[in-house]
Amino acid sequence: MNNGFFNSDFDSIFRRMMQDMQGSNQVGNKKYYINGKEVSPEELAQLTQQGSNQSAEQSAQAFQQAAQRQQGQQGGNGNYLEQIGRNLTQEARDGLLDPVIGRDKEIQETAEVLSRRTKNNPILVGEAGVGKTAIVEGLAQAIVEGNVPAAIKDKEIISVDISSLEAGTQYRGAFEENIQKLIEGVKSSQNAVLFFDEIHQIIGSGATGSDSGSKGLSDILKPALSRGEISIIGATTQDEYRNNILKDAALTRRFNEVLVNEPSAKDTVEILKGIREKFEEHHQVKLPDDVLKACVDLSIQYIPQRLLPDKAIDVLDITAAHLSAQSPAVDKVETEKRISELENDKRKAVSAEEYKKADDIQNEIKSLQDKLENSNGEHTAVATVHDISDTIQRLTGIPVSQMDDNDIERLKNISNRLRSKIIGQDQAVEMVSRAIRRNRAGFDDGNRPIGSFLFVGPTGVGKTELAKQLAIDLFGNKDALIRLDMSEYSDTTAVSKMIGTTAGYVGYDDNSNTLTEKVRRNPYSVILFDEIEKANPQILTLLLQVMDDGNLTDGQGNVINFKNTIIICTSNAGFGNGNDAEEKDIMHEMKKFFRPEFLNRFNGIVEFLHLDKDALQDIVNLLLDDVQVTLDKKGITMDVSQDAKDWLIEEGYDEELGARPLRRIVEQQVRDKITDYYLDHTDVKHVDIDVEDNELVVKGK
C-alpha cells in the first residue's frame, strides 16, 4: 500500500522511537520504586538480601493463617453457632439469667414438645410483655438443674438473631450459605436447640424476590424441621402468628403452639420477689414487699394498655433507677480512681524521703477507703409506695397519690369544691361526686367507666361547666376534657369520626383525630358528648358498649379501654320541666328522644334546674373573680360595690337563658369599661366600680 501516511518521514520517526525504548532498558536508565519511593539498585539489592531469609517462613505462616480462616468460614460450624448466637444454657450455668417464677406449666409444655422424636419445635405465642423469652430462659435453667425429660437433658439452647444471618450477605447465595452452615452446625453438635425470638421474621427473610430464584429462611428450614434434624423454639405475638405463620400451612404443621397468657397479679408479685435481689444489687436500693405489690396494683390501674409482668417490672426498674440517681451515694469509680492516684503520690513521696507527706497521703487513702466501704450499706436508699406513685405519675401524667389521710379528706371534700364552682346544681354535683369517691377508693367493679351521666336541662345552667371542673379537679388539667359537639356527628358517616374508617375506605391508616385514638393517648379523660340528641343513632349504639363494658374497638381492630374515663352527655330535652318535676317526668321526656336501653346504661340522669337570682349572686362573684385574675397580670386591684353587683344581676338575669346573658353583661359593662379607663390612665393601680344614675362607672386611683 502506498499512501501519504506511510512515507519516509514516518519510518524515521518510528526508528527514532525504537532507539529511545532500547536506551531506556539499559541498566543505567532503570528506576526502582518501593511503596511509591524511588530507590537505587544498590538499595534494592540490600533489601532483597535481608528479606530472603524470612520469606519462606512468612509465606508458610501466611498460607497457614489463610487456611485457618477458610476453615473457620466454611467448616467451623461449631464456631459459627458461637458467632451468631448466645448459649442460654451456659449463661444459666454461670448464673447470669434472672430466676423465672410462676411459669412452670409453660416450661413443662415446651420441654414436652422438645422431647418429641419429630416435629419437636415449640412456638411460644403470647402478647408483648407476658414473658415469652423468660420462659425459654427458664427452660435453660431447668436443663441445668436436670428438671427436664431425659431426651433433652443435654441440650444447649442457642439464641439466634435473624439479622445476624443476613448481615454481610451482599452476593447471591451468601445468605443460603449461612443457613446451611447453621444447619450443619446444629447437626454436628447433636445437642443444639435454636431459639428465634420474633420468629415470624423468618417468613421471606433472605429472599430477594419471586423472580430471582432466591429462597427465604423458612423455605430452607422446612425440610430439616420436618425430619427432626434440627430443633427450633420460636416466640411471637398472636397477631404476627396469625398474619405470618398461619398463612404458611407447611410451616405451621412443623410447629407446636404453646400459649403464653398474662400472669395474674398474685403471680406477678411473686415474679418481682424472685428478681428483687438482682435489682437491689444493681441499683443499690432496698425494695420492700409493699413496694412490689404497689408496682403491680398501680400498673394494672394506670397502665392498662400494657401487660403484666413487663409493665410492673418496668415501674420497679424506673423507680429504683430514679432513687439511685437521687441518692447521695459515693461514686465508686471516681473514688477508686482517686485512691489509685494517691497510692502513686505516696510511692513518689517515699522515694523522695518525704515521710511526713507520705503519712498524710496514707491517712487520706484510709479515709476514702472507709467512705467507700460505708457507702455499700449505710447510704442505701429504701423505696416507698409513694415513690411508685411518683413513677406512675411521670409515666402517665396522671396525678397519682397514695391513699393517705390527706387524700381521703380530698375525696370527702370533692363535692364542696365542685359546688363552689357550679352554682345551684347540688343534685348533679352530689351524684357525680359519689361516683368519683367510689372509684378512687377502689369499691367499683372496675370494668365500666368511672361514671356515665346524662345531664338534661335548659341552656346556660352549668352542664358543660361541671364537665370542665371535673377535668381540672380529677386530672389537674382542663385539657383532659374531650369535648364532642354532636351536631357534627348527625350524618350517617359519623361513626368513622368516632372509631376510624374500616379497611378498604379512604383514611384507614390515619385515625389520629378519632375518639378512640384520643382516649388511647390519654386514657384518663372526661368525655363530653354535647347535645347528644343531635347525634346519629349509630353513635348511640356505640355508646351502649362503652357504658356497659368499658371498651370500644376501633376501625383497625384495636380494643380501647374507657374504664378510666368519665362519660357525660348533655341534652336540652326536658327543658320545660320546672323545679318540682319528678324523675318519672324526666324519663317520660327522655323516652321521646332516646331508646330505653340507652337511658338504662347511665349511672344517673340528672335534671339541671333553672337558676334564680340568689344563684346568680354567687355566679357574678365568680365572674368578677375571673376579671380580677386578668387585672393581676397588670398589677391592678379591683373593688366592686354590692350595688354594682345587684345592677349586673338585674341586667343579666334571664330565667330561660341561664347564666350566659350575665357573662355577656360582665364582658360589656366591666371588662370593656376597665379597658377604656386603662387606656386613658396607664398608671392606674386600683379601680372602684359602682353605680351612678343607673349606669356602671369606673374610677381609678
Curated annotation (Swiss-Prot):
* Single GO term (MF): ATP hydrolysis activity
Record's InterPro entries?
AAA+_ATPase (IPR003593), ATPase_AAA_core (IPR003959), Clp_ATPase_C (IPR019489), ClpA/B (IPR001270), ClpA/ClpB_AAA_lid (IPR041546), ClpA_ClpB (IPR050130), P-loop_NTPase (IPR027417)
Q: Domain of life, per the record?
A: Bacteria
Q: Where is this region: I?
A: 81-332
List residues of the UVR domain: 336-371
* This protein's GO CC annotations: cytoplasm
Compositional bias per record (Low complexity), positions renumbered to this chain: 49-72
Instruction: Note down the stretches annotated as region Disordered.
Output: 45-81
* Protein residues bound to ATP: 126-133, 457-464
Q: Which UniProt keywords apply?
A: ATP-binding, Chaperone, Nucleotide-binding
Renumbered to this chain, region (II) spans: 383-575
* UniProt GO BP: cellular response to heat
Its annotated function is as follows: Required for the development of induced thermotolerance.
Annotated family: Belongs to the ClpA/ClpB family. ClpL subfamily.
* Name this protein carries in UniProt: ATP-dependent Clp protease ATP-binding subunit ClpL
**What is the organism of origin for this protein?**
Staphylococcus aureus (strain N315)
As recorded in Swiss-Prot or TrEMBL, the protein's gene is named clpL
